Amino acid sequence: HRVGSVGKPLPNLQVKINQEDGYRQGEGEILVKGPSVMVGYYKNPEATAQAIDAQGWFHTGDIGMLDEGFLRITDRKKEIFKTSGGKYIAPLAIENKLRESPYVAQVIVVGENQKFPSAIILPEFETVRKWYQSQGKTIGSNEDLINREETKDLIKQIVDESNANFGQWEKIKQFRLVADEWSIASGELTPKLSIKRKVIVAKYKDLIDGIYSGNNHR
């Protein structure tokens, strides 16, 4: 097994990466074929035709790559978006990299049909407070915390470090910090704790619009 991969495909399973859609080099939708793959949707020929092509390949909807025989899944096809310049952005890969920081609780990457991707970031407030306390400072509310320049500088450093792992067109050019926690109860997260993209984009519509309307403060 290789770290970051889901292992090698089963012996009787054929795996192919469809690189026709123009993702990153070597990356594309994962197609599979073999006796263990479903033959179609019950009494739903339209759905079957969408999922299984004329050559019998099942289109998984996952984006990934083969790395020396190991299969690596990088995103879901339905979550990938294009910038106005026609470049594909795989938000999950960027979000996961940013969430590696102890100072980031949640993040969503936005920028569909825009010139560049941006991020809405929910800080891990407990960790950020400890960072302030280590400097002998105490902070009031979460709202106070996200408006402090030191917090923005801290998160910018994390964004810059994350950006080093991605292509020029994938780099987060701007971000905004938000103070309200995302949860299942308040509707931003699924029961599996995945983010509900449409809900979050709608919730922060004004904030996102501000990023792309020339309102360029961090």
Where are these regions (language model features)?
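Gly/Ser/Thr-rich phosphate-binding loop
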Residues: H1, Q14, A105
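Conserved C-terminal "lid"/linker of ANL adenylate-forming enzymes
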Residues: Q106-I108, W131, K156-R218
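Active-site phosphate/pyrophosphate- and oxyanion-stabilizing loops and adjacent acidic/basic residues
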Residues: G4, E46, E95-N96
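Conserved ATP-binding/catalytic segment of the ANL
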Residues: P9, N18, Y23-Q25, E29-T83, ...
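Conserved loop-to-beta-strand segment in the C-terminal subdomain of adenylate-forming
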Residues: G26, E112-K137, A164-A179
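Adenylate-forming
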Residues: V37, F70-R99, V128-R148, Q168-E170, ...
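C-terminal boundary motif of the adenylate-forming
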Residues: N18, I63, S101-T127
